[in-house]
């Protein structure tokens, strides 16, 4: 299954991914429309600031055996056939058990609807027929949408090419 993978060496914490996420999940699909919506949209991905001015975008990891799905008492959280963890907002009762169960803190307390908090989490832009909006918006290509095995292989190949092109050490 493809996942959003992060190159923390190139992320400059510009938050373009967060903005793209809000716009992609807005009713209007535009930045100005998203800003005007009430309740205000929250990104389903968050850039956490690290040391030395570096950022690290964090979102749902779409685990193979998700704790959040097991903790959901109303069965609002489920895994679709592609392996994406999704939420059926109509079934969500706002108990926040999934929020507590997620080991990555990737589930957010969303908007309050009818006195019940709904949750908000990354859905890999499942309704789009393309890469997730955050990946497309990243100006440094720090986010990629690919199979983790391919990502790992490509990283090894890149390292080997760099190693092969490095000047020999002088003793």
Name each region found by the language model:
Residues 11-14, 92:
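Short, thiol/selenol-centered motifs that function as redox-active sites or metal-ligating centers
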Residues 14-35:
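Core segments of cupin and vicinal oxygen chelate
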Residues 28-70, 90-91, 96-171:
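Flanking helices and flexible, charged tails adjoining ferredoxin-like Fe-S electron-transfer domains
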Residues 78-86, 94:
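Mid-length scaffold segments of soluble, non-membrane domains
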